[in-house]
């Protein structure tokens, strides 16, 4: 469409953001294991948004409402690097290989935070 600048203005700044192939709405299923409260099921819809050419940001476990987020970066071999975002502390991510399956458009993840009393999350996150 046509855009009109205010009288006396001669410049405009636009931000154009491209989405990567991992950007979208996902269904997450899995388990959040708390050291004292026990296990609880993860069964929810999550939105992951582009933050880089091969990276998306979304809710960590079921804690997005508390400000816990993660950045998933899909590497050339489809392994996934998980980095903390928001209020999320350092993550332990070496329980198993974390990876993305391009055939099913699914992330397979296992990670935890709080090394003294780990909160361990195991989840599959599939594009809807």
What are the residue ranges of the model-derived segments?
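Ser/Thr/Gly/Pro-rich, low-complexity flexible regions
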Residues: 11-128
């Amino acid at each position: 469409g046509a855009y009109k600048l205010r009288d006396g203005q001669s410049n405009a700044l636009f931000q154009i953001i491209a989405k990567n192939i991992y950007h979208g709405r996902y269904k997450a299923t899995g388990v959040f294991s708390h050291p004292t409260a026990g296990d609880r099921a993860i069964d929810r819809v999550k939105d992951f948004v582009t933050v880089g050419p091969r990276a998306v940001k979304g809710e960590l476990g079921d804690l997005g409402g508390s400000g816990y987020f993660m950045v998933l970066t899909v590497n050339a071999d489809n392994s996934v690097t998980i980095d903390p975002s928001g209020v999320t502390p350092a993550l332990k991510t070496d329980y198993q290989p974390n990876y993305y399956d391009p055939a099913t458009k699914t992330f397979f993840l296992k990670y935890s935070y709080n090394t003294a009393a780990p909160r361990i999350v195991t989840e599959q996150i599939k594009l809807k």
